From Swiss-Prot:
Keywords: DNA-directed RNA polymerase, Magnesium, Metal-binding, Nucleotidyltransferase, Transcription, Transferase, Zinc. It is an enzyme of class 2 (transferase). The keyword S-adenosyl-L-methionine does not apply. GO terms for molecular function: DNA binding; DNA-directed RNA polymerase activity; magnesium ion binding; zinc ion binding. Coiled coil: none annotated. GO terms for cellular component: DNA-directed RNA polymerase complex. Mg(2+) binds at residues 449, 451, 453. This is DNA-directed RNA polymerase subunit beta'. Belongs to the RNA polymerase beta' chain family. Binds 1 Mg(2+) ion per subunit. Pfam families: RNA_pol_Rpb1_1 (PF04997), RNA_pol_Rpb1_2 (PF00623), RNA_pol_Rpb1_3 (PF04983), RNA_pol_Rpb1_4 (PF05000), RNA_pol_Rpb1_5 (PF04998). The RNAP catalytic core consists of 2 alpha, 1 beta, 1 beta' and 1 omega subunit. When a sigma factor is associated with the core the holoenzyme is formed, which can initiate transcription. DNA-dependent RNA polymerase catalyzes the transcription of DNA into RNA using the four ribonucleoside triphosphates as substrates.
C-alpha cells in the first residue's frame, strides 16, 4: 500500500459545492458548542460528536459501546462511531446556506478576480453583493445593457416600462448567474483580439483579464465556484475550547465567527419560511454575506468584527498569515524535544571540538538513553523502574550517564542564527554547575560573548543524525567562513595580546650583538633564571631550521615548541592578521587536523602569556604628543585664511565649508600618525595601549586618537559634518560645548543599532526566500557564456587582486601568458591557489570565467559554474544548498554593519579629498587627450574632461655613448632577453618581461597601457613621452568646485539670464559681497540661461548652458582669456561615510528600486547637442555616426555632465545623479547590469571591511533576472506584456519552432527580491513568505501544481529537503555486495533470524524456570 506521505507534487484548486459536501461528515445546524452542565458537545452543534467523532477514545457518546473491539461500530442510540478521538483533528462538517454568498478573497483582494472576469469595478461589484443595486443579467430586447447597474428606483422604472422583458438581480445569486453564463473560450479569443489591436498601448488590466480567463480554462475550475452555497466547517480540535482554572472557557475566535454565520443563516431560513417583506430578507442576506466575509478574512473588513474583549477576532486568513500564522509559526519553525538552554561561560580547558554540558542538563536530555542503558545492564528490570531511578538521581545513574554521553554529539545553537555556523556540533564533556561551557575560539562564528548570552542544546537522536554531526557539523570541521573562504576560527583579544607579547622583539642597544646559545633547553633555562628576557634577541641552533643558527627570541622558541612539530618555524611578531594568515596557510597547504591542533596550542599559549604579561592601563600610558598645540595653531591659521578668502568673495559658502572640513580632517589624521609614533617610542614599543591596538587585541587607532590625540570632527544625526571640531581628547577632558556636540553621535549610534538590526534580519529573510531553491544539481550545464574578471582597483590601489578573484572558479576560455603565449589554463579547468598565483605572476590582465550568473541549469546551478565550496575549500558537491548559503553570507554581515556605528562614538569618518593626481610608481606618459588651453607657464588647463594614457614603468636602463641597442622601440621583451651591448663588451639583459620604449638615451621596460581620467579644470604639468617618477604631481585641481572655463579669448554675452526670473542677486550678510546665482524655479517661462563667448563683431565662438545654483564669476561684456573661470558650481557638501547609508543602499539594490534622483543615461554613443526646451525640461540630443538622433529630457534643475559638442558613450550619464539599474539593463544589457550590481553591492560591504565572495551575490542577482517580458507573441501561447520564466520562454519557443511557427520575442526583466520571491513557481513557498491570501487566491484559480523542488515547501509538508543526502537522486541508492545481492534484503533477513532465535531462547529460559517473569 502506498504511504499517504509519499507524493511528489501538490495541487491547489477551488472547491465546488459538491466537493465540500463530500469532505463533510454531517451538517452543523445549531450554533451551540458544549452543554454548560455536562460539558459534553451539543448534538448538531459546532462540536457535535456524531459529525466530528468521539471525544473519548473508543467510546460512543452515550456509553453503550466502550472498547477498542467495537472499532468502527456506529451506535444505534446516539449515532456516534466508536473510534479514536484523534479523528476530531481531521473530520470536517458543513453549513448549507439559505442563499449563495461570495468568497471575500475573490472579490475584495486587489485586483478583484470576479471584477476582472465580469469587467466590473470593485465598487460596482460590492454594491451588487451587498444588496444596494441591481445588475442586468439578461437585457432581452430592451435598451438596457448586460452588466448594467440599476438603483432601486431605476429598476422599478424599468419594470414598469419593459415588464418582464429583461432579467436583473442583486446579491451573490445574480453574480453567480453571470459567472455561470460566461463562455470562457469566446471571452479569451475576444480579449486576445483586443490585445493584438492595442499592441504596446494595451493596459495592465487587459493582460490581467486574459491571464485570469486562461487560468480558469486550463485549471478546470468553474468561475461560479467563487460563490459559495455551502461552507466547510473545519475540525473542532483545530478550533478548540479549553476550560480554564476558574471554570471559565477559552475558545478559538473561529467558533464565534461560525456561530454568527449559523445564527444569521437560521434566521434567514425562518424569515424566508415566514415570507417576510423583501427589505428585511435582503438585509438578512447582506448580514449573512458579512458574517461569511468575517469568517474567511476579518482583517479585510472595515470595521472588523470584534469579540468580547474589544479586539478584532482572528479569522481563517489571519490564522495563516504573518509571523504568528500557521506557516511561519508552526510549519517552518517548530519547538523540538530533547533540547535545553542555559547561560554560557568560557571553557579555556576544552579542546576545539568539545563543549561543557552541565550534568543536570545531560541527565534530562539523555533520559531515554539512560533508561535503556539501565535496563540493558540489568541494573533495573523494566523501564518504569529505570525512570524512577533517574528521577531520584541515584549514583548508579551517573555512572551510566558518562557512558551514554561519551561519543554522543550534541548541537549548540545561539540565536540569532545568522549563518550556518550558528549551529555546530560538539562532543559533550560533563561539568559541574548549571552553565554550558563554550570553547573561546568558536565565539566568533557564533558571535557569542560571555556577558550573559544563552545557548540552546539539541540532541541528535538517530544514527544518521549523529553521523551527520560527526562528519559535517563538528566545530573542528567548520574553520572557514562560508561567505569568503577565510578562517573564522582564530584567536582574539587576550590570546592575541599574549601571542603578540610573547613574539615581540626588543631592539638591541647600539653596537650590541645578540647572545648565542647552543640549544633550546639552554635558552629556556636562561630565560627562566632571568639572564635574558623573553623578548631579547638571541642566536640559537634550531632543529626546525636544519640546525642552522637563527636570530630569534626566547618567546618565539616557546611558541614553536608548543605548536605541532610539522608546522614550519615561525619567526615573526604575531598580530591578529599574521595569526590568521598562519592558520590559513597551515589549513590550506598542510592539513585541517594540524590546524585544529595548532589552534588549541595557540589558545593555551595566548592565555598563559597574557596572564604572564599582566597588561595594565594607567593615565601615563596615554601620551598626548607635544606638537599638538602647534598643529592646532597651524590649522586655526589655515581656517582663518579660508574665512578671509570667503569674506573677500573669492570662494562660496560651500567651498569655505568643504575646505574647513578638509583642514581639520587632515590635521586630525596627521596628529593621529604623530601620536602613534610617540606611543611606539614609549617603553621601547611595550606601551600597553599601543600593544593592544597594533596587535589587534582591542581598540583601534581611531579610539586611541580620541584618548590621546583629538576627538576630531563630529557628525550631526543627518550625516552632515559639524565644522567645529572637538580639539580636546578624553585625557584632557572635553569642555561643555564639546561635550554637547558629542552627545549627537552617541545617541545616533544607539538608535541606529536598535532600528537597523530588524532591517538586516528582514533583508536576510527576503534573500533566503528568493534563493532557497537553488541547489547544485548537475556536473556541467554546458554553457558557452561567462564573465570577464579583472583585479578590483580604486584609482591605482589594488583592492582585490586578480588571483583572489579567480581562485576556486572554472575557466571558460584558454588563458595564455601575455608575452610568451605559453598555455597557463585550458578550457573548463579548475583554478586552485597555485594556478591563480601563476596567472597573476604572468601579468594577465583579465580572465574569462564561468559564473553562477551565466549558468544555464534549469533548476539550481551546476558544479562548473559554481566552483569552490568556500566553507570546505574543495570543489562543491552535488546537493549543496548554495542558495541558502549565499543568502546567509549577504545577510549576516548586514547585521554586523548595523552594530558598527556606536563603537566609534559618532566621530565623523570623512575621507580627505585629493587635489592632485599622483602615482605611487614611476610611469611613462603615452599621450594626453581632451580639450585644453595652453597656459603661459607651459602647462595645459583642461576645459573639459580629458584622459591620460600611460604605462607603468617596470625597469629603466641608461645608455652610454656607443652602446648598441638590440631591441626595437615598442617591441615585446621577455625576461632575460638581451637589451643592449655596452662599449666595453658587456651584455645587459632584461630583468622583467614587458614592452621596450627607447626615449633619448634611456631604455624603459613598461607594462600594458592604462588610462586615468583628468577632471574638468585640471592643470596638467606633464607632456607626452615624459617619464614621471613616483609621487610627482601630474595634475592639480580644486576638489570642491566644478568650474566652467572659457575655451577661447573673447567677450562675455549673457542669454536668457534675467534678474528676477533666472538670476538671483543676494548680498551675503557675512561678507558684504553681491553673489549672483542662476535659478530655474520659475517654470512656465521657456528660458535657458547660458553664456556666450563672442568675438569683437558679436559672432558666437562658444556657448555654455548654466545649471541651477551656478555662480556667475564674470560680468556681461567683460573681455576674458581662454581658461578664465566663467561659472563655478559647488560640489555637494561632505557627509560621513557610514554604513547607515550602507544597509538601505544594499536593500535598494536588491529591491531593484529606481533611485530618487536617477541620472539620465545616453541611449547610444554619439555627439551631444542641445535643442531647446520641452515642458520645462532641456532636450539633449545624441547623434550617432549614422546621423540618427535620440532625444533625452533632462530637468532644468539638474547639473549637466556633458556640454555641446561632447562625445558620449552609450550608458554614460548626461546629468548628475545615481545610475538606475533598469536603465542600464535597457541600454547596455544584462551583462552590464550584472557587473554594476555586483560592484555596487560589494563596494558597500567593502567600505566596512567585510568581504563577500562574488558567487554569493551573483546567485541572488541571477534569481532577480529569471523572468522575461514578452514583447512580441509570435505563434506561442504567451500574451503581450506577460512575465515568463526564462526557461519556460525558451521551451515554448523551441516547441513552436519545431512546428514551423514564429517564436516569441522577450526582453529581460529585473525584479526586486520581494517581487521575485512572490512570483516563484512554488505557491507553498510564496505563501509562507508574504501576502499569503493573494498568493493562495492566484494559485487556486490557476490550479497550480507545486513540484516541491525548493527547500521551504518540503519543510512545510514534512518531507526530506531536496539537498544533500535528501536529493531525489540519492533516495533510490541501493547497496549490493560483491555477488550483486541486495544488502537491504540481507540485513532484514539477518534481523528476522535474530528475532526468532531470541524468542526461542526466551521460551526455553521460561520453560526451565517453570513460570513467566514478573513485570518485564
Amino acid at each position: 500500500m502506498k504511504d499517504i506521505r509519499d507524493f511528489d507534487s501538490l495541487q491547489i484548486k477551488l472547491a465546488s459545492p459538491d466537493t465540500i459536501r463530500a469532505w463533510s461528515y454531517g451538517e452543523v445546524k445549531k450554533p451551540e458548542t458544549i452543554n454548560y452542565r455536562t460539558l459534553r458537545p451539543e448534538r448538531e452543534g459546532l462540536f457535535c460528536e456524531r459529525i466530528f467523532g468521539t471525544t473519548k477514545e473508543w467510546e460512543c457518546f452515550c456509553g453503550k459501546f466502550k472498547s477498542i473491539r467495537y472499532r468502527g461500530v456506529i451506535c444505534d442510540r446516539c449515532g456516534v462511531e466508536v473510534t479514536h478521538f484523534k479523528v476530531r483533528r481531521e473530520r470536517m462538517g458543513h453549513i448549507e446556506l439559505a442563499t449563495p454568498v461570495s468568497h471575500i478573497w475573490y472579490y475584495r483582494c486587489v485586483p478583484s478576480r470576479m471584477g476582472l472576469l465580469l469587467d466590473l469595478q470593485v465598487i460596482a461589484l460590492r454594491s451588487v453583493l451587498y444588496y444596494e443595486k441591481y445588475i442586468v443579467i439578461e437585457p432581452g430586447d430592451t435598451d438596457l445593457k448586460k452588466n448594467q447597474l440599476l438603483t432601486e428606483t431605476e429598476y422599478n422604472d424599468a419594470q414598469e416600462r419593459y415588464g418582464g422583458g429583461f432579467t436583473a438581480g442583486m446579491g451573490a445569486e445574480a453574480i453567480r448567474t453571470l459567472l455561470q453564463n460566461l463562455d470562457l473560450d469566446a471571452l479569451v479569443a475576444q480579449l486576445r483580439e483586443k490585445m493584438m489591436e492595442k499592441g504596446a498601448k494595451s493596459d495592465k488590466r487587459l493582460l490581467r483579464r486574459i491571464e485570469i480567463v486562461e487560468n480558469f480554462r486550463v485549471s478546470g475550475n468553474k468561475p461560479e465556484w467563487m460563490i459559495l452555497s455551502v461552507i466547510p466547517v473545519i475540525p473542532p480540535d483545530l478550533r478548540p475550547m479549553v476550560q480554564l482554572d476558574g471554570g471559565r472557557f477559552a475558545t478559538s475566535d473561529l467558533n464565534d465567527l461560525y456561530r454568527r454565520v449559523i445564527h444569521r443563516n437560521s434566521r434567514l431560513i425562518r424569515l424566508m419560511e415566514l415570507k417576510a417583506p423583501d427589505i428585511i430578507i435582503r438585509n438578512e442576506k447582506r448580514m449573512l454575506q458579512e458574517a461569511v466575509d468575517a469568517l474567511f478574512d476579518n482583517s479585510k473588513r472595515k470595521p472588523a468584527i470584534k469579540g468580547a474583549s474589544n479586539r478584532p477576532l482572528k479569522s481563517i486568513s489571519d490564522m495563516l498569515k504573518g509571523k504568528q500564522g500557521r506557516f511561519r509559526q508552526n510549519l517552518l519553525g517548530k519547538r523540538v524535544d530533547y533540547s535545553g538552554r542555559s547561560v554560557i561561560v568560557v571553557g579555556p580547558e576544552l579542546k576545539l571540538w568539545q563543549c561543557g554540558l552541565p550534568t543536570k542538563m545531560a541527565l534530562e536530555l539523555f533520559k531515554p538513553f539512560i533508561m535503556k542503558k539501565l535496563v540493558e545492564k540489568e541494573i533495573v528490570s523494566n523501564i518504569k523502574k529505570a525512570k524512577m531511578l533517574v528521577e531520584q538521581e541515584s549514583p548508579k545513574v551517573f555512572s551510566v550517564l558518562d557512558e551514554v554521553v561519551k561519543e554522543h554529539p550534541v548541537m549548540l545553537n545561539r540565536a540569532p542564527t545568522l549563518h550556518r555556523l550558528g549551529i555546530q556540533a560538539f562532543e559533550p564533556v560533563l561539568v559541574e554547575g548549571k552553565a554550558i561551557r563554550l570553547h573561546p575560539l568558536v565565539c566568533k562564528p557564533f558571535n557569542a560573548d560571555f556577558d550573559g548570552d544563552q545557548m540552546a542544546v539539541h540532541v541528535p537522536l538517530t544514527q544518521a543524525a549523529q553521523m551527520e554531526c560527526w562528519t559535517l557539523m563538528l566545530s573542528n570541521r567548520n574553520l572557514l567562513d562560508p561567505a569568503n573562504g577565510r578562517t573564522i576560527v582564530y584567536p582574539s583579544q587576550d590570546m592575541v595580546l599574549g601571542l603578540y607579547y610573547l613574539t615581540k622583539e626588543r631592539s638591541l642597544p647600539e653596537g650590541a650583538r645578540p647572545r648565542r646559545f647552543s640549544s633550546v633547553e639552554e635558552v629556556m633555562m636562561a630565560a627562566e633564571k632571568g639572564v635574558i628576557g623573553w623578548q631579547d634577541q638571541i642566536q640559537v641552533r634550531y632543529h626546525k631550521c636544519d640546525g642552522q643558527l637563527v636570530v630569534t627570541t626566547a618567546g618565539r622558541l616557546v611558541l614553536n615548541e608548543e605548536v605541532p612539530a610539522e608546522i614550519p618555524f615561525v619567526n615573526e611578531t604575531l598580530d591578529d592578521k599574521r595569526i590568521r594568515k598562519l592558520i590559513e596557510r597551515v589549513f590550506k597547504r598542510q592539513d585541517s587536523w594540524l590546524a585544529v591542533q595548532m589552534l588549541d596550542a595557540l589558545k593555551t599559549i595566548g592565555y598563559t602569556y597574557a596572564t604572564f604579561f599582566g597588561a595594565t592601563l594607567s593615565m601615563d600610558d596615554i601620551i598626548v604628543p607635544e606638537q599638538k598645540v602647534q598643529m592646532l595653531e597651524k590649522a586655526n591659521k589655515e581656517v582663518l585664511a579660508i574665512a578671509s578668502q570667503y569674506r573677500g568673495g573669492h570662494i562660496t559658502q560651500e567651498e569655505r565649508y568643504n575646505r574647513v572640513v578638509e583642514v581639520w580632517s587632515k590635521t586630525s589624521e596627521e596628529l593621529t600618525s604623530l601620536m602613534m609614533e610617540t606611543l611606539e617610542r614609549d617603553k621601547d614599543g611595550f606601551n600597553t595601549i599601543y600593544m593592544m591596538a597594533t596587535s589587534g587585541a582591542r581598540g583601534s587607532r581611531n579610539q586611541i586618537r580620541q584618548l590621546a590625540g583629538m576627538r576630531g570632527l563630529m557628525a550631526k544625526p543627518s550625516g552632515d559634518i559639524i565644522e567645529l571640531p572637538i580639539r580636546s581628547n578624553f585625557k584632557e577632558g572635553l569642555n561643555v560645548i564639546e561635550f554637547f556636540i558629542s552627545t549627537n553621535g552617541a545617541r545616533k549610534g544607539l538608535a541606529d543599532t536598535a532600528l537597523k538590526t530588524a532591517d538586516a534580519g528582514y533583508l536576510t529573510r527576503r534573500l533566503v526566500d528568493i534563493a532557497q531553491d537553488v541547489v547544485v544539481n548537475e556536473e556541467d550545464c554546458g554553457t558557452i557564456n561567462g564573465i570577464e574578471y579583472r583585479a578590483v582597483k580604486s584609482g591605482d590601489e589594488i583592492i582585490e587582486s586578480l588571483a583572489e578573484r579567480i581562485v576556486g572558479k572554472y575557466t571558460l576560455e584558454r588563458v595564455e601568458h601575455p608575452i610568451t603565449h605559453e598555455l597557463l589554463l585550458d578550457v573548463n579547468e579548475y583554478i586552485d591557489d597555485e594556478r591563480a598565483e601563476k596567472v597573476e605572476e604572468a601579468g594577465v590582465e583579465s580572465v574569462k570565467l564561468r559564473t553562477v550568473l551565466t549558468c544555464e541549469s534549469k533548476r539550481g546551478v551546476c558544479v562548473c559554474c559554481y566552483g569552490r565550496n568556500l566553507a570546505r575549500n574543495k570543489i562543491v558537491e552535488i546537493g549543496e544548498a548554495v542558495g541558502i548559503v549565499a543568502a546567509q553570507s549577504i545577510g549576516q554581515p548586514g547585521t554586523q554593519l548595523t552594530m558598527r556605528t556606536f563603537h566609534v562614538g559618532g566621530t565623523a569618518s570623512s575621507t580627505t579629498e585629493e587635489n592632485r593626481i599622483t602615482f605611487k610608481y614611476p610611469i611613462l606618459v603615452k599621450s594626453i587627450e581632451g580639450v585644453h588651453v595652453k597656459m603661459e607657464d607651459g602647462s595645459q588647463l583642461f576645459t573639459r574632461r580629458g584622459t591620460l594614457f600611460f604605462h607603468k614603468t617596470l625597469a629603466e636602463y641608461q645608455l652610454q655613448e656607443g652602446d648598441s641597442v638590440q631591441v626595437r622601440d615598442r617591441a615585446r621583451v621577455l625576461k632575460d632577453e638581451v637589451l643592449y651591448h655596452t662599449t666595453d663588451g658587456q651584455t645587459v639583459y632584461a630583468s622583467v618581461s614587458g614592452f621596450a620604449r627607447i626615449i633619448d638615451r634611456t631604455v624603459y621596460l613598461v607594462g600594458p597601457e592604462q588610462k586615468t581620467e583628468i577632471r574638468n579644470g585640471s592643470n596638467v604639468v606633464i607632456k607626452a613621452d615624459e617619464y614621471v617618477p613616483p609621487g610627482k604631481t601630474v595634475a592639480t585641481f580644486d576638489p570642491f568646485t566644478e568650474p566652467i572655463l572659457a575655451e577661447q579669448d573673447g567677450f562675455v554675452r549673457y542669454e536668457d539670464i534675467i534678474l528676477g526670473s533666472t538670476l538671483i542677486e543676494e548680498v551675503n550678510t557675512e561678507t558684504g559681497m553681491v553673489e549672483r546665482r542662476i535659478t530655474t524655479l520659475k517654470t512656465g517661462i521657456q528660458l535657458q540661461p547660458r553664456v556666450f563667448i563672442s568675438d569683437e563683431s558679436g559672432n558666437a565662438l562658444g556657448s555654455y548652458y548654466l545649471p541651477e545654483e551656478a555662480r556667475l564669476m564674470v560680468e556681461e561684456g567683460a573681455q576674458v582669456k581662454a581658461g578664465t573661470v566663467i561659472v563655478k558650481l559647488a560640489k555637494a557638501i561632505q557627509k560621513t561615510s557610514d554604513i547607515t547609508g550602507g544597509l538601505p543602499r544594499v536593500s535598494e539594490l536588491f529591491e531593484a528600486r529606481r533611485p530618487k534622483n536617477a541620472a539620465v543615461l545616453a541611449q547610444i554613443s554619439g555627439v551631444v547637442s542641445f535643442k531647446g526646451l520641452f515642458k520645462g525640461k532641456r532636450i539633449v540630443v545624441v547623434r550617432d555616426h549614422y546621423g540618427k538622433e535620440y532625444k533625452h529630457l533632462v530637468s532644468m534643475s539638474r547639473q549637466l555632465l556633458v556640454r555641446d559638442g561632447d562625445t558620449v558613450e552609450a550608458g554614460e550619464r548626461l546629468c548628475d545623479g545615481c545610475f538606475d539599474p533598469h536603465d542600464i539593463l535597457a541600454i547596455l544589457g544584462e551583462n552590464a547590469l550584472q557587473n554594476y550590481l555586483m560592484n555596487e553591492i560589494r563596494d558597500v560591504y567593502r567600505v566596512q571591511g567585510v568581504s563577500i565572495n562574488d558567487q554569493h551575490i551573483g546567485l541572488v542577482v541571477r534569481q532577480m533576472l529569471r523572468k522575461t517580458e514578452v514583447v512580441s507573441v509570435g505563434d506561442t501561447r504567451f500574451i503581450y506584456g506577460q512575465q515568463v520564466d526564462k526557461y519556460r520562454f525558451h521551451e515554448e519557443n523551441r516547441r513552436v519552432e519545431a512546428e514551423g511557427g514564429q517564436p516569441a520575442v522577450a526582453r529581460p526583466m529585473f525584479q526586486g527580491i520581494t517581487k521575485a520571491a512572490l512570483n516563484i513557481d512554488s505557491f507553498i513557498s510564496a505563501a509562507s513568505f508574504q501576502e499569503t491570501n493573494k498568493v493562495l487566491t492566484n494559485a487556486a484559480i490557476a490550479g497550480s501544481v507545486d513540484d516541491l523542488c525548493g527547500l521551504k515547501e518540503n519543510v512545510i509538508i514534512g518531507h526530506l529537503i531536496p539537498a544533500g543526502t535528501g536529493m531525489r537522486r540519492y533516495r533510490q541508492v541501493k547497496l549490493f555486495d560483491k555477488n550483486k545481492r541486495d544488502l537491504d534484503v540481507q540485513m532484514e533477513e539477518v534481523i528476522r533470524r535474530r528475532k526468532l532465535e531470541e524468542e526461542a531462547l526466551a521460551q526455553a529460559v521460561a520453560g526451565m524456570e517453570g513460570e513467566p517473569e514478573g513485570e518485564a
